[in-house]
Structure formats: structure tokens, C-alpha cells
Amino acid sequence: KSTVNVARASGVANVVLVRGGESLAFGPFSVKPIRALHSLSGQATANIPADVTVPMTADAFAEGGTLQYLIGVEGRTILFIGTANFIESELDGLRPDVAIIAVGLREKVPDYSCRIMRALGQPRLVLANHFDAHRKPLGPEQMNIGDESRADLAHFAAEVHSCSPQTKVVIPTHFEPIAI
């Protein structure tokens, strides 16, 4: 409901509330919301009220429920995991062509990278996400990450390759296309 409240406050007229498990179609796209968990950051669960004022500061957002999304288009599927945690039974048996996987705070979840690879049947392409300076305005500045973050991204790729050696891991750069 929090996302719906922010969307409506932002002027989005047509909002569909989902809870996970639905199958939706939007023209050539299919979208399946998948129930999930937020990273183990210790952030309290809260709801964003319907009377929220936008734009919001980053610290005004709350964890009000987490979903992941399986998107289909033109015979291909992409799984978007936007936070470093998941419900394994919800992912078991999914076989996406591409998995977009959050890397931030994954170290708090036991065997995070390999458990995802096993649950998804070792997808051929993994894109890292949730590693940039996401509190900065959208643009090139978001990719100004430090040496520690770069080393963590290399470690993520090594984790994936340790249990899924054929998987290609890409660290995306904003506004650069990636062939899938």
C-alpha cells in the first residue's frame, strides 16, 4: 500500500495494487509480482500514509512490503530482485534469461548469491543492482562509487561464478545499453 500512496501522491492515475502471485499483462509485457523479503538491514517495517507529500527525502521512505518482479517480453524473461533478500520457495523453479540482483547488504543473508543461483537454475546473465549512490539525483554522479564498493562488486561476481561458472555477471553503467 505504501507504493500506491507514493504513486498517487505523485500524480499517477492508474495504479494496480498487487501483493505477489498475480499475473498481469500490459501490451507485449507480462509481469508477475513475487512475494519477497527486504534486506536484513534492521529497518523497521512501516507504512507510508495516504496523505504523503512528494517529493520525499530518502529518509522518509519506509519498508512497507517487498516484491520482486518476473517480466516477460518477446519470449524472454527478466527477474528483478531489488533488495538483498528473498523467499527461496518463491524463486524455486523460475528460469529467467536475466536476473537483476541487488548486491547491497547481501553479506547479512547466509549464502545469498549461490542460493539465488541454485533457486533460479543458474541464469545465463546476471546484472548487479543496488550498489550505486542511489541517494544522489539520477545521472552520472550515481556511478561515482569508491574502491570499497568496486571491490565488493568484484567479490559478488566471484560469488556467482563459484556456484554458476557459466553465468555472465555485468556491472551496469547508467544509460549504457546491455544486450540480452
Residue spans of the language-model regions?
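Binuclear metal-ion centers of metallo-dependent hydrolases, dominated by the metallo-beta-lactamase
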Residues: V16-S23, G93, R118-I180
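Short loop/turn motifs at secondary-structure junctions
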Residues: G11, S30, R95, G121-Q122
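Active-site glycine- and acidic-residue-rich loops that bind
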Residues: N14, I101-D111
